[in-house]
């Protein structure tokens, strides 16, 4: 069990040292690092949402269809919002988006239908909404990172590679339960913000250096 956990931890943090790699077109460049961990995190959120809703409503094609429809709708709305915002407003909005995503994922972890003082149908509706809501904020984060990418092909390659590793990370639910995927995906999404912080620091240094 210890070896299993160590290997999965290595998979999560493997791309971190490459954050400061200089080549901007490399698969290991900062922009690709963000896309990589975004792919990992989204895979975990998708797995958690599908699993929890299947446990609540039954593992049927109707439940799977509702989950897929919800994901596509929320992703579309997120992309629509990003398209309507200019780069400056989008950049200023990112701290709020990361903050709301953190709040929703923590609610996902701590909240359960049994803890809500409502009839079973209402409690399940609320937990379903909270389970799917992170996709909206995830879509905004993904689109904003992709919008900044200097090489879209490399960014998508890194994202797909992250999805592959995310498929491996799904096995962590064997150790910590399905709800633990919320915390792991939150960690990965916060890691995706590191290049943004680094970029902001570099921009501030350049601005200070100007006469």
Predicted segment positions?
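Alpha-helical transmembrane segments of multi-pass membrane proteins
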Residues: 1-211
